[in-house]
Structure formats: structure tokens, C-alpha cells
Amino acid sequence: MFQIRDFREGDTDALYDIALRSFDEYFDPSVFAYFRTQWRTGQLVACDVTGRPVGFIAGTRIESRKVRIMLFGVLPEYRNKGVGKQLLDAFRMRAMMEGYISVILEVRTSNTDARRFYLRNGFRETDILMHYYRDGGDGVRMAAPVQMNQ
């Protein structure tokens, strides 16, 4: 079991390192501060027993009843150990408690592991996004209710 907590100002360097090891695309580390201004409670960090961040999820509010996962990363050595599921469940619980009913995200079509993870966790693929990424890669939009039993 991993500790899930809110993002803290001092987390930026660790989360940026996780992002560099998780994503194919470069982005500016200031995005963490930006997302925090968009929806403070939608920024969660998973820590190991020593308190070191090993994963994170960053979301924003996009409509009156919908939230969007913008970034979701877990260190490679911590994947398939339940970190991602704990983060996603905590994110959905936060969204539900604030009255949101659905969550969306985008993922590369080539990222089959992530797509399987989301499908196992109640998401469905809703759109193919041709040339969605800067390098021309295609994406898939996925959506799910915030409550797992819906």
C-alpha cells in the first residue's frame, strides 16, 4: 500500500523526474504549478514507505461536471504494483465528492499498457485523435464515470 497525498510545493523536482521517465514528450515543469491553480484537489502524489514520490496524477476541471486527467505517471520500477490504481481511485473519489460525474483523458494509441489499465478501470475509448501529439503520434480519448459502479 502506498500513501496518497496532496501535491506539495517541494514535490516539483521529483514529479518532473517521474514525468521524464514516464512520457515521450517534453513539457515545462511549471505545468505542475499551473494545474494546481486549475484544481488544487486534483493533484495527487503517491509515496513509498520512505515518503519518496513514486507516482502522481494531475487533473483539471473542464466542465461543470467533468474532470480531465492531464498527466499521470508512475516510476517504471513501481508499475504493476497497485500505485496507479490507488492514484486513479483517489482521484475519482475526490472528483465524486466535489460533484463531478465523469473523467476524460487522452493517451497515445501506441501505449497499449496504459490503454489496458484504463479499460480495466472502467474507461472506454470514445475518439481516435489523429496526429494528436507534437511528434505526429495518434491519440485515443477515453472516458469513464467517476463512480466505478456506474
Can you name each region flagged by the protein language model?
Residues I62, G84, D135:
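Short, conserved glycine- and acidic-residue-centered signature motifs
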Residues E106, L119, R124-R141:
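Conserved catalytic-core motifs of GNAT/GCN5-like acyltransferases
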Residues F2, D6-E77, L88-A90, R94, ...:
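Acetyl-CoA-dependent GNAT
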